[in-house]
Every structure is written in structure tokens, then in C-alpha cells.
Amino acid sequence: MAPRIDDDFVFTISDHDDVSDDGGAEEIAAASAKLAGRGKKRKHTEDPDLNIRPKEAPSKKAKKDKKKGKKGKQAEPEPAAEDESDLEIAHPGEDVEGNDDIDSEFEFAVGDIDTGFVEEFDGWGNAEGTVGREQNAEKKSNAVDIDDIIERRQNKKMAEKDTMSDSEDEADKDDFSGFGEDDELLAEDGFGMGAGSDSDSEGDDEEDGDQDESKINNDSEGGAGESDDEDVAPHVPHPMDLEGAESDDAMSEQEDAVEAKKAAAFFAPEESESGKKKKGAKSIGSFHAMSLSRPIQKGLAAIGFTEPTPIQAKAIPIAMQGKDVVGGAETGSGKTAAFLIPILERLLYRPKKVPTTRVAIFMPTRELAVQCFNVATKLASFTDITFALLAGGFSSREQEVMLKTRPDVVIATPGRFIDHMHNTAAFQVEHLEILVLDEADRMLEEGFETQLNEILTTIPKSRQTMLFSATMTSTVDKLIRIGMDKPVRLMVDAKKHTVKGLTQEFIRLRQGKEDKRLAYLMYICEKIYTERVIIFFRQKKEAHRVRVVFALCGLKASELHGNMSQEQRIQAVEAFRSGKSSYLLATDVASRGLDIKNVSTVINYEAPQSHEIYLHRVGRTARAGRSGRACTLAAEPDRKVVKQAVKQSRDQGSKVVSRQVPVEETDRWMEKLRGLEDEIEDVLKEEKEERTLSITERDLKRGMNLIEHEAEIKSRPKRVWFETEKEKMAEREKGAAALNAAAGGSVKQKKKKLSGKDKKKLDARDERSEGKIWKKAKEDRGMDTNRAKEKKALAKNKSKKISKLSRR
């Protein structure tokens, strides 16, 4: 009779001893973990006894040794010692086998073993989160580097023993070697005296700030600075401000009344939500009071989140109920966690038999998508939820492999999401249950309109939709287009206000002094704000040029804009985050959502096109309760945006000051910049030549690959897109027009081929501009007509004679 088995566990094919020695289990486990993304692999895809198998062999050996008797134990003492060490490592697995009361699927250690508490979690600080960061650093070495070009040119000058260049280099080093406390000085008569970025001078700031605020509040134009010493005449308000103030207020009141009626019918009633809170009578002071699952609480503790922010306390309970949410809160208030936590909590109770993608989170920029991906994977490190990052600039082949594993959550930019939706067979969106639009007001603008419509018409209509932004739109018509069902509106300090810890400074550029803008910027960066500064530009070209100027002056800076490759963009953020560069020169690509730790100052080289963009720019500092400064160089065309910013700050009671730049410092930098103009042009020219050479090499390599692997390349299916190239260009132009229309600007129109009518109109206009010219009189015109008639008659007679001769 066969011996009775101790437990009722039924071995499958993978559990049999015949398969245990081939060594393939570990490879399969490693491969599945690699394909499954950053999270832990699923239970249904893993072999439940892969971790138990190495521990079964010693347990079976022990049973055989008992049957053999004491001789077997004495003969083999060394294997027994090895078995004890193995059992110590696999102690949890042994308990599962020995105790029938514990569930066999219970997991003692899930996720990364080295995961621990992280102080001041940074979305860019996750070493494993950023996709291929080290590989991207190697790829970036092929790109053109401004620092290398400048260093090479300086070495050439040193080799030529140019005494003038040597003296200039030494002067530059003397100017920028210190960055000490003595350098952070303002002019004695400066309007923002003592308004430095150092935290030690906060007491002086408050004393001077009271005077500054009183002065700037009297400036009815929303002044970007105090009048110069030369101006003695009292300030007179601008006529445009006086004319437009009353009409704007009247129009805004009418629009608010209409929108209020629409909102009352569209949004869920807020009273019912407040009534539920009163009945519950349980204040949410921590995440434990939200009844979150244990893995989610462990993930929050690992990041260092202990208490929810106001937007998190409001949004998480409602989002966990599956309701649509429209959330708005100030910058740096934790909106990302406000929608990630309820999503992860709901996914813990998903059906796990059939893997499918259930959540789609959309971001307007690639950097924001990478940051959200890192935060999500860190929060879900103690769960089996899987993630995929679909952003432009990364390898689409790697993303296709990741999508074959059917990740639970997809964090994407709209363009790459649509690309995979049309061209990747393994990517299915029919079972999406949750849709999230972060920075929703930007996603609803003209530039993303067609892409968003394409996504919304493809994914299921029966879904939960959540929108979040710091400047959340109140236009109901845009929200109706998304297909929301009685959404709950949650607004926490979202009245287009800045953060309380932010001090706003304005440097006014008088009319005719706009050419001194760069000199003002260089003085500020040299003397006042020397570390952890983000400088925003409107144009990519200007940001790159200033990057060259900074490099020539010895200031360590990185640039971030759309003309850079994705590898370069990530490297720029990493260099600034790690402290390798003190300045980040960026366009509005970095204005939304980017959360970099300890950014002390934000400088606007030019005021942005709208007040909403201004709020997002200055929101890169003073995040999560910290203090920070925002400095704006404002000229006459920036009057409207500056006026709105000062008015909102005055209503909010935040600190607004004006700063003056000493005239002698401005003149010194103007002379220095004039001397560097030729060097700047030479550097840009050399960079252009190197870039052209690298592009030629790339095209040559591509052509060689086309010849060598022609059959394989042609066998690949052609990638399709829902828009033509003309439609793409039209969409971009429409977005640029909408953006610049808000600032009262105009968009450059491309030259088109002139038709015949247009050419005649232009000729007529030229004739009119030339003035009076000689024209034929009536008699002359009559003579011409008579001659024409005579010629016509002669031609007819000739034709008749020819016809008669031909008949004969």
C-alpha cells in the first residue's frame, strides 16, 4: 500500500521533480519579470512554486534520512549544515508547507526587498524609474555639445598664445569664482532691497517688503517696477488700463453668470457631498483613516507620505467610489497622488484571470509622463500592478514588447498612445475603465483637440473620467465634449492664485530699453540668484543662444526645449536635479507639472502669453509648503499679464516687490555682451556644422541599413496615422494661433504661391503707389482702334483670296 501523503497538495506538471533540475525556471521567471514592466509580475503568470522548489529538495532529503537511520546522519554532516542555511533563507516558504492554516498564496515579501523610507521623495530621483537613463547618457555623447565646442575654442586660443584672450579668461574666472554671500547684494536705493533668495535674510525681507508692497500697490498699472530716479513726474495710469478695466469687469460678470447656470446643471450637487461628510463625522487626518489597503499604505510610507493634502483628502474618497472628478488645486499640492492612490486601490480588486489594460493616464509632455511613471511605480512597489510608459522619444519596439504583457496602467502622451492604438496588435483599449487627464486645461486646448477626439471616440464610453490641473478650466462646453457623467467638482485654492510661500519680483524694462534684457538677466544670475534656478523663455532659439552666453561666461547651465532629442532632454533635467548645472534654461515644455526638488528661483526672461502660463511657470518653486521666489523681466507689451499677476497677488495678500538693476552693472554687462557677439556667432556656426555632419552620418548609416536589410524592412507593416501631414501642420498652426491670440500677438503666415488675381492686385497697388504716370489720351486710343480695324479687314480679304485660289 502506498504511503499516505501528508497534505492534500496536488502537484502539477511544473511541480514535478523531473522538471526541477533543468535550470529553466529561473530564466523564465527573470524573462517574465523583465517584460512585465517595473512592477511585480502577476500571480497568474508566475509559477506558484518556483520560490518553493529549492526548499523542497532539502525537506525530502530529511525524510529519507529519517528512514535510513542515524548512520545516514553521521555520514553526511556537511550537507545537513547546508540544509540548515537553506532553511534559514527559505523560512517563510517552509512555514507555508508546514502549516495548513496559512494560505499557500500568502506572500511575506512582495516587491523590491531594498525598498525603504525615502525622505523628500523626488519623482526624478528614482534610479530604476527613468527608462534607460544610463543608456541615454551614452547616446547623448553622439550629439553636439556646446561646452565641448567652447572648451575646444578656448584651447585653440591658449595654444596661439593670445594675450588678450588669456586676460579675458582670467577676468571671467575672477568674476564667477566666488558665488559667496558677499555677492548677493542689491543697490542701496533698490526697490527690492533685501529681497534676496537666502533664507537667513527673511526678517529684512519682511521689513523692506512692507514698504515695497505699499509702493507697488499704488502702481495702478500693475507696475513691473518703480520709476527711475530721473523721472520726477507723478505716475499717470495708462489710458488702455482705464478704458479696458470697466468693460472687462462687466463682460466677466456676464460670462460668470452664464457659466454658473451651465455648471449647476452639469456638475453633481456639492451640498450632498458636504452632507455625507457631516453624517460620517470622521475627519481625514491621515491615510489610515481612508481605509486604504495595506500594500498602498506601505507604498505611501516608503515615499514619506503621512498626511493627505487638502486635494488628496477630498479627491481620494470620491474617486474610490468610481465617480467622475474635476479637481483643481495650486501647484505642488499633490494632485498626482490624488488620482494615483484611488486608481491603485481599485486595481487591487481587479479580476486577475484575464490580464488587460484598465487605466489610461494622459500627460501633455514627455517629462511629466516620465515623472508620473516613477511616482506610480514607487507607490505600487508592494503590489502586483504593472505599468507601461508610452511617450514619444523612446523606442516604440520596446514599448510594443511591454504592451504584449497587457499592463494594468498605461501612462502616455496622446500622440504615442494613438500610434500604438493603430499599429500595435497587442494593445487593446476596449476594456479601459478609468481615464485621467493631468494638466487638463492644456489637454483641452487647440493643439491636442484632434488627438483627444480620436482617443475619446475609440475608448469605451462607460468609464470613470478624472481631470486635474492647477488652472482648471470652468468652461462647461469643453467638459461636456469629454463625456463626463455628473462629475464632482473639487476646487481647493484653485482661483488662479499663487502659492503662499512665493515672493514675486518684477524688473521693469522701460520703453526703448528692451535691448538690455539679457544684461539684466546676466547680472541677476551673477550676483543674486546663483543656485537652483529655472529660466523660462518663449522661443527655443533664444533659450539656446542664452545657453551659449552662459557657457562663455562660465555659468553651468542646461537647456530644455522641443528641438532636443529625448535623451538630451532627460539628461538636462538630470544634470539640473543632481546639481551639475545651476541653471535650467527651458521653454514652456517644463512649465507644467515638473517637480524638481529644492528649486529656489524661477526667472521669466519674458512674461508669458497668459496669466495661466505664468502661474504654472512660477509654480515650479515654492512647492509642498516651501518658500521660493519668482522674478519676471517685464516690458511694455507684457503689461496685461503683469497687471493680472499683481492684482491676484494683492487680493491674495502675497508678497510682491520690484527690483532695480544698478546702471553701472547694466553698462558693464552690455559692453561684455557686445564683445562676445562674434564669439557667440562663431560657436553657433561651428555647432551647426557639427550637427549637419552628424545628420549626414546618420542618413548614411540609415541608407546602408536599407541596402543590407532591405527585405526585412520592406516586410514590416506600414505604420498608419489618423491625420495627414497637412492636417498635422494645420493643427499646430491652430494651437500656436490660439496661444498667441491670448497674448494679443500674431502668428507668422507661411508664403504661398500667388494666383493671377493676386498678382494683378499687387501690380495695381504698385502702380497706385508710383503716383501719376502717362496714359494714352482719347484721341490716341481712337487712332489705335482704327488701325486695328484696318488690319483686321486686310486679314479677312487675304483669307478670302486664299480660299478662292484653293477652290480653283
Swiss-Prot record:
State the compartments where it is located.
Nucleus, Nucleolus
| Entry-linked InterPro entries | DEAD/DEAH_box_helicase_dom, DEAD_box_RNA_helicase, Helicase_ATP-bd, Helicase_C-like, P-loop_NTPase, RNA-helicase_DEAD-box_CS, RNA_helicase_DEAD_Q_motif
The residues that hold ATP are A329, E330, T331, G332, S333, G334, K335, T336
**Low complexity compositional bias, start-end:** 737-747
Protein keywords: ATP-binding, Helicase, Hydrolase, Nucleotide-binding, Nucleus, Ribosome biogenesis, RNA-binding
User: Residue spans with biased composition (Acidic residues)?
Assistant: 95-106, 199-211, 243-257
Which domain of life, per UniProt? Eukaryota
Residues forming the Helicase ATP-binding domain are: 316-490
GO process annotations (BP): ribosomal large subunit assembly; rRNA processing
An example GO CC term for this entry is: nucleolus
Q: Where is the composition biased (Basic and acidic residues)?
A: 44-59, 149-164, 755-793
The UniProt entry annotates the motif DEAD box at: 438-441
Q: Which CDD domains match?
A: DEADc_DDX27, SF2_C_DEAD
Q: What EC number(s) would the UniProt record show?
A: 3.6.4.13
Q: Spans of biased composition, class Basic residues?
A: 60-72, 794-808
Q: Which SUPFAM superfamilies match?
A: P-loop containing nucleoside triphosphate hydrolases
Q: Which reaction does it catalyse?
A: ATP + H2O = ADP + phosphate + H(+)
Q: Which family does it belong to?
A: Belongs to the DEAD box helicase family. DDX27/DRS1 subfamily.
Q: What is known of its domains?
A: The Q motif is unique to and characteristic of the DEAD box family of RNA helicases and controls ATP binding and hydrolysis.
Q: What is this protein's record name?
A: ATP-dependent RNA helicase DRS1
Q: What species is this protein from?
A: Phaeosphaeria nodorum (strain SN15 / ATCC MYA-4574 / FGSC 10173)
Question: Gene of origin?
Answer: DRS1
